[in-house]
């Protein structure tokens, strides 16, 4: 019996089973122990293969691919710390709903806890973060192929969101010519090999039913809060709220067009919060809210009913409102709960939103990151998409901009880490094939700098804006100790990104004014390559501008 040949047949069953659940993209890191999985993936023509030398970036690349494709994405890594590097992407997927299938090669059991090289305790290492965890045995003909395929089908067939960890131990030898070893074992699956359906089909998950008292609540004074959702859902939510006559507070990720812009500014005005207190019901569609003032209002509001609609399971309400947690696809839920045409009941808030936007516009001429956040709509590529980083940049765009309704916006706002942002943006571009504008801060770019290697392979123009404010200026908005702020919080690095772009043969610009920025964009959108635009700004101007606008709008 050839161990290497049977390893490959075992792996081929695993990989073929994944195709029956919509897996098309597969991300592969280099490694020896993962050879059976890698070769099985290479031989399966269903897959689109992606490679990267850094497993942490590879996990985030898969995350970006899954965000756009809405399908599970598989990742193959070797044993040891390579597996641990997938943890951040797995955590993010669990919070934002992407489906990741982590195929982690492992040493066989007799090599664990005995000093063998690159052998760690991998089963269960991700704790409760995967939706399902499978610890496979070493490949053996004593276990029928139908057990292997049905085990995978059960995990993937019941997967609605998050990750599946499939730990795959393989004994040596890992290399060798293929022979007939295990062929009869594999063939016992019969015509499954010619089919395209799972071996084991699971019943679909039950979703929340229609709320039978909706006809009653839609006649009340309501507020719609829109969190993260798809572009198509964002347009539908905007129309739904408009028909009801309810104010819509739209997050930067809602893609609703934010009909009441600058919410994070006007929610700091007592007139606005006083008017919102009249609401009898709040319907929150989507989770992962960004704005600080929005979260503060959400925590303090006490309507008669607070409904949260999202297809991700879990409470999704850090304020623990009394109400209803409705698990449903947002578009489907809107169809079951149609709006009834009513006149708007809020009078003060539309006026405050308009005045807040005018206050922002009055400051748009200075060359800074707050002004860039406001102007970002001017630079969006046609038929393209936006990827927004974390920390200060996403808060500024949320507070100061008004993104077009239905324009695709992506981010990592589950755990909201700054790790893996460039890798995720690369995945977003690859899965969509669209022109992409990505914007991150300087520390985020440094954190994932080797992901610039992934940005060499794009199918449409990609512009990466690095807002260089020399450190983590988000901490300027927090009551961090002034005496220790720079050393322990901001951590300025005093670097520029010209040489990093050159190392990966990417185009680079460092504009000094708006005209130069517009020229850089015009050049970047002409060719299907990546352009790094570094916008060097004064350290604290962005945070100070936001604070000044908050103070100004609070007194309107």
Curated annotation (Swiss-Prot):
Pathway membership of this protein?
Quinol/quinone metabolism; 1,4-dihydroxy-2-naphthoate biosynthesis; 1,4-dihydroxy-2-naphthoate from chorismate: step 2/7; Quinol/quinone metabolism; menaquinone biosynthesis
Q: MF terms per GO, please?
A: 2-succinyl-5-enolpyruvyl-6-hydroxy-3-cyclohexene-1-carboxylic-acid synthase activity; magnesium ion binding; manganese ion binding; thiamine pyrophosphate binding
Q: Does the keyword DNA-binding apply?
A: no
Instruction: Report if keyword 4Fe-4S is assigned.
Output: no
**What EC number(s) are associated with this protein in UniProt?**
2.2.1.9
Q: Please cite one Gene Ontology biological process associated with this protein.
A: menaquinone biosynthetic process
Textual note on the cofactor: Binds 1 thiamine pyrophosphate per subunit.
Q: Which InterPro entries match?
A: MenaQ_synth_MenD (IPR004433), MenD_middle (IPR032264), THDP-binding (IPR029061), Thiamin_PyroP_enz_TPP-bd_dom (IPR012001), TPP_enzyme_TPP-bd (IPR011766)
Question: Could you tell me which CDD domains the record lists for this protein?
Answer: TPP_PYR_MenD, TPP_SHCHC_synthase
* EC class (word): transferase
What cofactor requirement does the entry state?
Mg(2+); Mn(2+); thiamine diphosphate
> Keywords in UniProt for this one?
Magnesium, Manganese, Menaquinone biosynthesis, Metal-binding, Thiamine pyrophosphate, Transferase
Q: Which reaction does it catalyse?
A: isochorismate + 2-oxoglutarate + H(+) = 5-enolpyruvoyl-6-hydroxy-2-succinyl-cyclohex-3-ene-1-carboxylate + CO2
Tell me where on the tree of life, at the top rank, the source sits.
Bacteria
What role does this protein play?
A: Catalyzes the thiamine diphosphate-dependent decarboxylation of 2-oxoglutarate and the subsequent addition of the resulting succinic semialdehyde-thiamine pyrophosphate anion to isochorismate to yield 2-succinyl-5-enolpyruvyl-6-hydroxy-3-cyclohexene-1-carboxylate (SEPHCHC).
UniProt subunit comment: Homodimer.
Protein family according to the UniProt entry: Belongs to the TPP enzyme family. MenD subfamily.
Tell me the protein's name: 2-succinyl-5-enolpyruvyl-6-hydroxy-3-cyclohexene-1-carboxylate synthase
Native organism? Escherichia coli (strain 55989 / EAEC)
- Gene (name only): menD
């Amino acid at each position: 019996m050839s161990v290497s040949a049977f390893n490959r047949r075992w792996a081929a069953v695993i990989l073929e089973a994944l195709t029956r659940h919509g897996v098309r993209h597969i991300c592969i890191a280099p490694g020896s122990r993962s050879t059976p999985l890698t070769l099985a993936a290479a031989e399966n023509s269903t897959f689109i293969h992606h490679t990267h030398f850094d497993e942490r970036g590879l996990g985030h690349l898969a995350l970006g691919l899954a965000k756009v494709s809405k399908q599970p994405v598989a990742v193959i890594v070797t044993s040891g710390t390579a597996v641990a590097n997938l943890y951040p992407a797995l955590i993010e997927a669990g919070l934002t709903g992407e489906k990741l299938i982590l195929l982690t090669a492992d040493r066989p059991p007799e090599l664990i806890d005995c000093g063998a090289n690159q052998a760690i305790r991998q089963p269960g290492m991700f704790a409760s973060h995967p939706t399902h965890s499978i610890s496979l045995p070493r490949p053996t003909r004593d276990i029928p192929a139908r057990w292997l395929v049905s085990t995978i089908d059960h995990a993937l067939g019941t997967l609605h969101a998050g990750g599946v960890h499939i730990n795959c131990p393989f004994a040596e030898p890992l290399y060798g010519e293929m022979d007939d070893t295990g062929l009869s074992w594999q063939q016992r699956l019969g015509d499954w090999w010619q089919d395209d359906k799972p071996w084991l089909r699971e019943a679909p998950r039950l979703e929340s039913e229609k709320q039978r008292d909706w006809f009653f609540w839609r006649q009340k004074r309501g507020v719609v809060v829109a969190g993260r959702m798809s572009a198509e859902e964002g347009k539908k939510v905007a129309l739904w709220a408009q028909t009801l006559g309810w104010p819509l507070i739209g997050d930067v990720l809602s893609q609703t067009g934010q009909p009441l812009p600058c919410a994070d500014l006007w929610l700091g005005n007592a007139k606005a919060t006083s008017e919102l207190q009249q609401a009898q019901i709040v319907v929150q569609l989507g989770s992962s809210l960004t704005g600080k003032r929005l979260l503060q209002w959400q925590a303090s509001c006490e309507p008669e009913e607070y409904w949260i609609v999202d297809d991700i399971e879990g409470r999704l309400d850090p304020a623990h409102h009394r109400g209803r947690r409705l698990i449903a696809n947002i578009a489907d839920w809107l169809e079951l709960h149609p709006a009834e045409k009513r006149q708007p009941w809020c009078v003060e808030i539309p006026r405050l939103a308009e005045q807040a936007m005018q206050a922002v516009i009055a400051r748009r001429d200075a060359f800074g990151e707050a002004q860039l956040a406001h102007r970002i709509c001017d630079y969006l590529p046609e038929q393209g998409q936006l990827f927004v980083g974390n920390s200060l940049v996403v808060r500024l765009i949320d507070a100061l901009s008004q993104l077009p309704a239905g324009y695709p916006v992506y981010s990592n706002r589950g755990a909201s880490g700054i790790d893996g942002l460039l890798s995720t943006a690369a995945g977003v571009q690859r899965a969509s094939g669209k022109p992409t504008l990505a914007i991150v801060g300087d520390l985020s770019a440094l954190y994932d700098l080797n992901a610039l290697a992934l940005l060499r392979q794009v199918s449409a123009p990609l512009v990466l804006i690095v807002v260089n404010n020399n450190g983590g200026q988000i901490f300027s908005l927090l009551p961090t100790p002034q005496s220790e702020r720079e050393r322990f919080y901001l951590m300025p690095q005093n670097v520029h990104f010209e040489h990093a772009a050159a190392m990966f043969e990417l185009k680079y610009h460092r504009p000094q004014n708006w005209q130069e920025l517009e020229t850089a964009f015009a050049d970047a959108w002409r060719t299907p390559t990546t352009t790094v635009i570094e916008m060097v700004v004064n350290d604290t101007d962005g945070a100070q501008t936001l604070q000044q606008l908050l103070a100004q709008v609070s007194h309107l």
